[in-house]
Structure formats: structure tokens, C-alpha cells
Amino acid sequence: MTSDDVSAIEVTDGVRSLHLEWDDPGIAVLGMIQLTRDELVERIRTGELPLPPLAKLLNIEVVDAAPGRMTLRLTPDERHVNFLGVVGGGVVGAVLDVAMWGAVQLSVQDKSMLTTVSMTSNLVRGVSHTQRALEAVAEAVHVGRTTATAESRLVDAAGKVYATATATFVRMGGGNG
């Protein structure tokens, strides 16, 4: 997915609108079940396997993916703003969560899927909707038979940290790793 996939925000009489389109999320689930880990990594990295609809809504795209790590790009805009006029902490948390999930999911050799059961995030500085793209860089810390953990950080192009997070994931069927 690229930022070209998301239509520009349109303004008519001061009202903003955004048209979104996404692929059937079942395609990605089916791909995860049918592909080897290496095939899954490659198809996510190239954009051949669609990200979930949440990625379109939040304007997230894959920068890089490999077993044990994932980097996503968030391009903030007005859709992300809270009542204080800055990008909401929930948006930041969601991007970090998706990146950490990718890092641990791409680490498993079997067909099990992982889901987040606990996440802690720390917002270090505010994110403006007018700033340039930020990257959520995540790494798997532990991938075991039943649980996995990961850590991530949201950084700008200069490496300045905006947020950090850690998460625990649990396996849901498919094997014992």
C-alpha cells in the first residue's frame, strides 16, 4: 500500500471528507494460512498482500518487514487530530501495535496467529498533524510456544523519538512454534 492509495482530504464549504477503499480483509487472513513465513514476509514487504482496513483508515504503509521486525510509516493529517489539536494517543498506540504485531507474527514458522493481549505505550512528545511522516519501528523481543513480546518506537526522519511501546501477544492455534 502506498500513500497514493488514499484519496486526498477534500474540503467543500469548510467541511472535510475522505473517501477510503480497501481490500477484503479475508484475503490477508487466507494468505497468512496458505503462505510460508518467507512468502508472507515478501508479500507484506512488497504490498502484494493487503494490510487490514485499519491501515487505510490510519494512513499507514509498510516501509520494511522481516522475521522479527517491521517498520510502518504513518503520515499524520487532520483525520488523526483529537480535541487538543494534536494526533491522538490512540492513533499513535494503534500504529505501534500494528508494527509490533507484524514483528512477532513474521517470526513464527507455523500457521499460528498472534493477537495482542497487553500493551503499554509512552507518549514522549506531541505529534502534529502537519509534520512529515513518522516511522513505527518494531522488533520482536521473545517469540515462544504460547506468547510473544515486542517493543517499538515512533520516530521522525532524524531519529527523534515521539513514543515507545511494549506488548505481549498470545498464539491462537496452528502449532506450537
Sequence positions of predicted segments:
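Terminal targeting signals and extreme-terminal segments of soluble enzymes
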Residues: 1-177
